[in-house]
């Protein structure tokens, strides 16, 4: 079991089998949970319901199971809908109104918008780079230099860019639904996959592991 984050870094989970009680964490099943945001999914749902009066968009959790399955191609949507700190929307209005909507979320609601491949996540400010840094910090606090820290990041959307720039090794995964991610021009150790996820993840890690002489425990 390894630590992980969800909802674009809004919430972190650390397995109790590896980590002792972590500051500011809550007990959640077999994990210590840390929330990096200050509004939960229910609060965001209520905010978005009010904003629907002025803008044209759909809140994903309001759609039928059939429509969500068609949009996502997922076999099981339970985990996708089990959100703690955010809501997903599909924008159906024009660009001008989207700019106005974005201002209201950011300024009036103190929130952020993370554009994924097909959906937009609405939450309190968070991103995967912040989550990655926090996980690294907690590793260091818990184990000091026991574990070798060389961060590898894989991503295929704009909301992965900050995390990819932060990592020592960045794997940009091909994505037909999104424009190519542009990383910092001085960024080193960047690998671009030829395949899309999930095979692009495997392709990237296999080639990176070869470059690192088998240091990745696959």
Residue ranges and their predicted role:
Residues 1-61, 175:
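Active-site phosphate-binding/coordination module
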Residues 5-6, 14, 59, 70, ...:
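Structural signal for conserved beta-strand scaffold positions within catalytic alpha/beta enzyme cores
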Residues 51-152, 158:
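Conserved acidic, metal-coordinating active-site core of Asp-based
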Residues 1, 85, 167-168:
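Short, well-ordered alpha-helix to beta-strand connector turns
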Residues 8-18, 84-89, 105-108, 142-145, ...:
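Short, basic, helix/turn surface patches
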Residues 42-45, 49, 99, 133, ...:
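Generic alpha-helical structural signal
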Residues 18-23, 72-75, 207-211:
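Short, surface-exposed amphipathic charged segments that create phosphate/polyanion-binding patches used
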Residues 106, 119-218:
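Mg2+-dependent phosphoryl-transfer enzymes with acidic/Ser/Thr/Gly-rich catalytic loops
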């Amino acid at each position: 079991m390894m630590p992980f984050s969800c909802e674009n870094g809004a919430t972190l989970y650390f397995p109790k089998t590896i980590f002792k009680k972590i500051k500011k964490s809550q007990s959640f099943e077999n994990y210590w949970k840390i929330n990096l945001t200050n509004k939960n999914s229910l609060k965001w749902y209520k905010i978005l319901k009010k904003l629907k009066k002025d803008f044209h968009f759909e809140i994903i959790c309001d759609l039928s199971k059939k429509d969500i399955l068609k949009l996502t191609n997922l076999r099981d949507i339970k985990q996708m809908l089990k959100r703690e700190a955010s809501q997903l929307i599909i924008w159906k209005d024009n660009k001008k109104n989207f700019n106005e909507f974005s201002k209201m979320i950011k300024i009036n609601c103190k929130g952020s918008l993370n554009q994924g491949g097909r959906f937009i996540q609405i939450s309190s400010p968070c991103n995967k780079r912040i989550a990655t840094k926090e996980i690294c910090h907690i590793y260091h606090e818990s184990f000091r230099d026991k574990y070798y820290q060389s961060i590898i990041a894989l991503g295929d959307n704009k909301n992965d860019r900050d995390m990819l720039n932060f990592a020592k090794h960045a794997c940009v995964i091909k994505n037909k639904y999104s424009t190519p991610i542009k990383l910092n021009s001085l960024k080193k150790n960047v690998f671009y996959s030829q395949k899309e996820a999930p095979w692009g993840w495997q392709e990237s890690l296999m080639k990176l592991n070869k470059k690192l002489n088998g240091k990745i425990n696959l």
